[in-house]
């Protein structure tokens, strides 16, 4: 085992132990979640740094039919039709989301840790954005970053399945043995496999439980699961 991976395992286990000492938190149902067949193909991230932002936009589309209709058709009640092509409208929304998640203040106006856009979207910024905008949850539903220890991937898989089983879409950070490098959005799953939206292709990918456990995902060229962003059973103040 590489030294960096050994240190990562140790750090992840310490974080998980700290989380385990907190009061038990239960996933809440997703009252706004639509059916997963509403996930339309062809929603591709506009550049190589916006996979997380694309997942945020698609999660909100799944939870907000008016927002999804506007992105798909440019039409929304009470407003002039947006003339941009669907691909351009989606790309612009993703890029605007990326700016919002990476600046010094978030969607709520509260200060946050800025993050270089060239490095993508930090997990904590993605969690904050979902807490404020809701995604497939009601706005104000707290989200937190689940650290996926290489020694406890099975537990993390069960947590993700539990969340999607309640109607939530779950962002999943994947990468190599050294770093997280990409984000996909898990939109369905069971004990055997997960179904995820991959913004690199704009289409669905299947992640088997065995591949998740072994760190052999083969998702957009990446193998290791690193973080999942999941809702918890309370609302933000």
Question: Which residue stretches match the model-derived regions?
Answer:
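Active-site nucleophile-adjacent alpha helix/oxyanion-hole segment immediately C-terminal to the catalytic cysteine
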Residues: 2-108
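Conserved active-site-adjacent core of cysteine acyl-enzyme catalytic domains
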Residues: 4-5, 14-17, 22-25, 84-231, ...
